[in-house]
């Protein structure tokens, strides 16, 4: 059994001594679509280990994963513990009230498994769920309250994975978080700053959330020792009774009541919706870039498809001769990215409802045709979606997918690995808190309008459907089939770009994973070219404008966490834009 007092004292000491200090002048204004504001940047160096490694978004989470592996646990065991801890210490980003995508590498049998724990639409919704008459609701009006809450899936997916690949008993995996919730954790700078922004319209409205995040009417302060006994009780129930404790019984009744009686935007969730949720195992999406196999999640995640598309369309470009902050690289990267996002918006949705075979979108010949227009000297143009499906009558939809998410990467002592991206969507989700955790607002990842020009939008709202996601947990394998990289990021729909750019840094520019994560970020979602503020890449604004780019210099708050196998060592990388740390041995 885990010695809970040892963990608590170690974790609290780490948090008290190694919390990141952010600039007091950190920009607090948000770009449209970036509500989880940037909270600063601190340079990080690669962490090297030999036996195992954990990289997560908060020191408490990294150390509980390390603790589990030291007790003989597997990568999946560590993932269960990390997710429970993130629910406590990083509640704005993910939690047991949300969903997740999990990649698991079984090193002994050399098999990659994927688990879909994406949230699901309740049975009572319809295609007009977010329509206000003939017009779609404004996104910020739709996000708050019960209407946006999807049936959670993260715990169910972890339970399914644990039944297959866990080593330690399920009921031992929550001990660290339960103890920390009972005794208190140190509120991090990032959590305190995000609460202080006072941006979420519902966080002060719902009593349970308001009481927790605004004690005595004031926002949580950095350094406060915060307890969450309600979450400790919930996790004790999950530890003893499994995921059904969340999906059936008294807690399920509380969730349904909170959703359906919300004072803002009440929803229509049923006990049957919660009880009937089923996580799914899906085939991974894999393709070869250079001599590497790039593998990710299948739909409803667009990550596996789109990360590979973006990379493959750049394969004909001499990227290794370019500099990461050069005009040439920024121009070709933006062109490939625009082509990728055009396809994403038109074609990708939950394939249990949209029967378009995604293999056509990663077909080598199709991507070669798409890439013919990419040229380092060519002015940028808004891209049109391709035509991988012939004459299928499909309308291009839009959805607002926001960057409130968390990612962690794990390699255990046996070489098994986890890449898991987990989310409640918006900063603090729907704003509704039940049982000490926040409920997601993932239904706003659907396209609000069900049709466009009389044609159906693939990512429209439907009962039992899972909304499209850009979450991109990714693994990279060499030409012999050996695992080389485990990576992923938060960042809303920009996740695809963050992961692809980092992989280019490793594969084409020859950087280690920390150097690649540190690279100044740029994105183009077929709208404008975003350059990371305060970095050398921002100097490209003028030359890219001359190439007809619409350029915005903004904060780009990725949260990449990854592990690289190199020369017999494990190299861990944690994003300097967030609070994550790499630990191991």
Question: Where is each model-derived feature located?
Answer:
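Extended C-terminal subregions enriched in glycine
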Residues: 464-466, 499, 508-555
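Glycine-rich phosphate/pyrophosphate-binding beta-alpha loops
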Residues: 295-304, 405-409, 419-431, 468, ...
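Short, small/polar residue-rich loop motifs at catalytic or cofactor-binding pockets
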Residues: 280-281, 402-405, 469-471
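Active-site rim segments in enzyme catalytic domains, especially the processed small/beta chain
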Residues: 88-95, 99-113, 265-270, 416-480, ...
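Bacterial N-terminal signal peptides
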Residues: 9-21
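Internal maturation/activation junctions in enzymes
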Residues: 31-32, 316-423, 575
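Noncatalytic scaffold domains of N-terminal-nucleophile
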Residues: 27-63, 67, 75-76, 80-242, ...
């Amino acid at each position: 059994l885990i010695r809970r007092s040892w963990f608590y004292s170690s974790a609290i000491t780490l948090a008290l001594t190694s919390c990141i200090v952010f600039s007091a002048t950190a920009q607090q204004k948000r770009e449209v679509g970036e509500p989880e504001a940037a909270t600063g940047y601190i340079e990080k160096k690669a962490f090297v280990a030999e036996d195992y490694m954990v990289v997560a978004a908060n020191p408490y989470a990294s150390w509980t994963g390390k603790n589990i592996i030291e007790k003989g646990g597997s990568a999946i065991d560590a993932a269960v513990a990390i997710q429970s801890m993130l629910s406590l210490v990083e509640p704005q980003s993910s939690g047991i009230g949300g969903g997740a995508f999990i990649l698991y590498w079984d090193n002994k049998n050399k098999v990659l498994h994927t688990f879909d724990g994406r949230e699901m639409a309740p049975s009572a919704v319809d295609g007009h769920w977010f329509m206000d008459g003939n017009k779609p609701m404004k996104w910020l009006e739709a996000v708050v309250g019960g209407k946006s809450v999807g049936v959670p899936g993260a715990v169910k997916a972890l339970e399914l994975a644990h039944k297959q690949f866990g080593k330690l008993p399920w009921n031992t995996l929550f001990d660290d978080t339960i103890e920390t919730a009972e005794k208190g954790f140190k509120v991090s700078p990032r959590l305190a700053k995000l609460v202080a922004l006072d941006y979420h319209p519902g966080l002060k409205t719902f009593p349970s959330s308001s009481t927790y995040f605004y004690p005595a009417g004031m926002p949580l302060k950095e350094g406060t020792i915060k307890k969450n006994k309600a979450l400790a009780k919930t996790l004790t129930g999950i530890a003893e009774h499994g995921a059904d404790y969340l999906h059936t019984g008294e807690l399920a009744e509380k969730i349904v009541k909170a959703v359906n009686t919300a004072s803002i935007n009440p929803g229509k969730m049923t006990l049957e919706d919660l009880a009937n949720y089923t996580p799914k195992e899906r085939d991974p999406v894999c393709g070869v870039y250079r001599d590497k196999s790039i593998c990710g999640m299948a739909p409803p995640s667009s990550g596996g498809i789109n990360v590979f598309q973006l990379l493959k369309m750049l394969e004909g470009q001499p990227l290794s001769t370019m500099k990461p902050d050069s005009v040439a690289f920024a121009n070709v990267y933006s062109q490939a990215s625009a082509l990728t996002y055009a396809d994403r918006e038109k074609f990708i949705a939950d394939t249990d409802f949209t029967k378009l075979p995604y293999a056509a979108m990663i077909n080598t010949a199709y991507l070669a045709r798409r890439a013919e227009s990419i040229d380092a000297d060519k002015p940028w143009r808004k891209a049109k979606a391709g035509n991988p499906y012939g004459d299928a009558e499909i309308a291009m939809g839009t959805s607002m997918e926001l960057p409130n998410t968390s990612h962690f990467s794990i390699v255990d002592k046996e070489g098994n690995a986890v890449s898991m991206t987990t989310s409640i969507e918006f900063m603090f989700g729907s704003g509704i808190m039940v049982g000490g955790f926040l409920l997601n607002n993932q239904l706003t990842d659907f396209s609000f309008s069900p049709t466009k020009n009389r044609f159906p939008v693939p990512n429209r709202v439907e009962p039992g459907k899972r909304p499209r996601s850009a979450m991109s947990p990714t693994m990279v394998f060499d030409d012999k089939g050996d695992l080389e990289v485990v990576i992923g990021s938060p960042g809303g729909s920009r996740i695809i770009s963050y992961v692809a750019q980092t992989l280019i840094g490793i594969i084409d520019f020859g950087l280690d994973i920390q150097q690649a994560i540190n690279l100044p970020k740029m994105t183009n979602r077929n709208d404008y070219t975003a350059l990371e503020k305060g970095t050398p890449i921002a100097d490209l604004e003028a030359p890219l404008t001359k190439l007809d780019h619409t350029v915005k210099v903004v904060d780009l708050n990725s949260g990449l966490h990854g592990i690289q196998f190199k020369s017999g060592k494990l190299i861990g990388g944690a994003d300097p834009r967030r609070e994550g740390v790499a630990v191991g041995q």
